[in-house]
Regions:
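Functionally engaged cysteine thiol sites
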Residues: 91-92
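Mid-chain, well-packed structural core segment of small domains
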Residues: 56-88
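N-terminal pre-ligand scaffold of iron-sulfur
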Residues: 1-63, 80-81, 95-115
Length: 115
């Protein structure tokens, strides 16, 4: 079952940008990352597969403009914006945990899948 966990205005993320989104009512303090690449909109849990820490706690450091990649501020692992696969860094080949995301009528909706 897919349950909406957050929503933000579509205008809050331009192409080739990433943003952090609070997930309300979550006891683990998790946040989501939303990325708009040139090809698609993607969302992931803000947790590095290398050591489980948040990739970043300040959205202005989340997107590496030179590489067009999401970047972990701790060990500089970089992740492909459409797939979430780490293509350079200590967790090379590992993937961020994806979240279903949809864009409808000026809003980005982020979901969590539950059994």
């Amino acid at each position: 079952m897919k349950v909406e966990i957050a929503r933000i205005p579509s205008s809050s993320i331009a192409p080739h940008e990433a943003s952090m989104v609070d997930i309300p009512n979550n006891v683990d303090g998790l946040t989501a990352i939303v990325v708009r690449s040139s090809k698609k909109l993607s969302a992931w849990i803000n947790s590095c597969p290398h050591d489980g820490r948040q990739l970043c706690n300040d959205p202005k450091y989340l997107w590496n403009k030179e590489l067009n990649r999401v970047q972990c501020m701790h060990h500089q692992a970089v992740f492909e914006p459409e797939t979430g696969i780490c293509d350079n860094g200590p967790c090379r080949g590992e993937t961020l945990t994806s979240l279903p995301v949809e864009e409808k009528i000026g809003e980005i909706l982020i979901f969590m899948n539950y059994l």
